[in-house]
């Protein structure tokens, strides 16, 4: 959404721009590649990543391609990828081979790159994708890969600040000097964003029961709301955690099942959708 205009992209390669006041389609175009990431609108351009590990920059005025760049493609990847992010005059893209690459926003000139994924000398079959959206705080970028590392790098030149072994799919959240993140084992971790020192770890439980795939909790979060950390499972379980101590303050069931997409959070309510496309409001 930008300036009363709504950008639509999909897995068929369609890109459309609508006027939100009356629903009129302003322009429509398409590319031959499925679009896997949400779009980023920045300084007059729409940026997104496609299934062949390519980033596109499209002019929001007319839908014409401004530039594109392709890095090494990966056959093993997640169904969706995270969105590019913007920092000053650069667009930073997370690719499915574990690379973060920064580009000049209007020319597509690469500025720097950093690999977030752990390099395996044994297997080429690991998923290296970056499913968690990179987070920019001050002059640093924090990024988590599906197989390998949580890293902090300079948004200016890509120089690595620190890295720790951790894998996951959920976007971290930062408050003050603390970074909160859920790893692939369903553990909520609080660490120092400057040094990577771990303050506490809380086990949200990877499985609802047993260890079968159908019982994976697939936690969404963390979400910092009113100075509390909210975490929501696929089965509709809500766990509220203290950001200071990591203690689980409450566990409740919100009454819906099949929660896969992150909520939309407003000032006094949040909205969730389930795998059947039903939308729910919670206050």
Please place each PLM-identified region on the residue numbering.
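Loop/turn-rich, solvent-exposed surfaces of beta-rich toroidal or solenoidal domains
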Residues: 178-193, 197, 201-240
């Amino acid at each position: 959404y930008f300036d009363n205009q709504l950008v639509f992209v999909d897995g068929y390669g369609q890109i459309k721009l609508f006027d939100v006041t009356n629903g009129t389609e302003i322009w429509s175009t398409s590319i031959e590649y499925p679009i896997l990431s949400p779009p980023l609108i920045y300084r007059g351009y729409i940026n997104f990543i496609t299934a062949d590990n390519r980033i596109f920059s499209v002019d929001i005025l007319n839908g014409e391609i401004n530039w594109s760049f392709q890095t090494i493609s990966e056959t093993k990847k997640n169904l969706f990828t995270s969105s590019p992010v913007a920092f000053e005059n650069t667009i930073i893209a997370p690719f499915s081979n574990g690379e973060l690459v920064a580009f000049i926003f209007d020319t597509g000139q690469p500025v720097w790159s950093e690999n977030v994924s752990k390099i395996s000398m044994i297997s080429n079959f690991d998923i290296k994708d970056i499913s968690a959206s990179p987070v920019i705080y001050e002059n640093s970028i924090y990024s988590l890969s599906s197989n390998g590392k949580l890293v902090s790098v300079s948004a200016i030149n890509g120089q690595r600040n620190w890295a720790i072994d951790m894998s996951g799919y959920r976007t971290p959240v930062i408050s003050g000097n603390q970074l909160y993140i859920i790893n692939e084992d369903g553990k909520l971790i609080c660490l120092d964003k400057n040094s990577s020192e771990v303050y506490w770890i809380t086990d949200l439980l990877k499985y609802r029961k047993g260890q079968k795939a159908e019982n994976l909790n697939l936690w969404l979060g963390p979400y910092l709301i009113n100075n509390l950390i909210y975490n929501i499972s696929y089965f509709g379980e809500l766990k509220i955690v203290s950001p200071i101590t990591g203690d689980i303050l409450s566990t409740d069931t919100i009454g819906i099942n099949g929660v896969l997409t992150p909520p939309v959070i407003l000032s006094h309510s949040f909205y969730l959708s389930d795998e059947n496309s039903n939308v729910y409001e919670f206050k």
